[in-house]
Amino acid sequence: MSRLLDVMERLRKDCPWDREQTTESLRTNTLEEVYELSDAILSGRPEEVKKELGDVLLHIVFYSTIGEEQGTFDLCDVANTLCNKLIYRHPHVYGEAVAASAGAVVERWEELKQQEKGGNKTVLSGVPASLPTLIKAYRIQDKARGVGFDWEQPEDVWTKVDEELRELREAITSGSAEDSEAELGDFLFSVINVARKYGINPDNALERTNAKFIRRFGYVEAKAKEAGRSLRDMTLAEMDALWDEAKRLESQP
């Protein structure tokens, strides 16, 4: 870590690009690096995860170095603030409190987080506005669950999904674009609730499906190219046949 800090100090002095960066200019790059880390994790390749973790760490050091230059905070301040928070929010580890389950730990975490804000923070105010919409919906639902606003049984969510699907169909049939958009949002929100109630990460689930579609469609495209065909000139039945072939190959041991 000391070596990394020395490298960053040198870059801030001698590299024109690094020298002109600010917390604002780095923000979008930081988001990109976090998404690349997410991709590496989903790929299951430890070497890629290690590499992308380094890129994210670079940004943490970058922000901390800028803070130190401005006299507001340094990396030690960041680490100590984090340590203090972790110790405070884990009274079952560093104190006398008892947590019988992971769920109890999360509930206590939220209670302590609320107390840190003097009790003036609303339940949902801790959900970042800039979160991707799917993740934001999950976090909103989970925050509400933390105070008891949730379906009593997982099966109850299916009734809500059926209700929202019916309302979506009715809105689309009516031809109202505004109503259709609103009902589609309600339907998607209810589907995310299903995922949450059954312990499924909806973002991971959708990303795996995205990857599966890209993989299978790539197979269709490659086979068409081998045959000297263009996808635009193929019938849907021909493309479906190649798609099914890709599925069969994936299912083979």
Please tell me what each predicted stretch does.
Residues 1-53, 58-184, 188-253:
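Flexible "arm" and connector segments at domain edges
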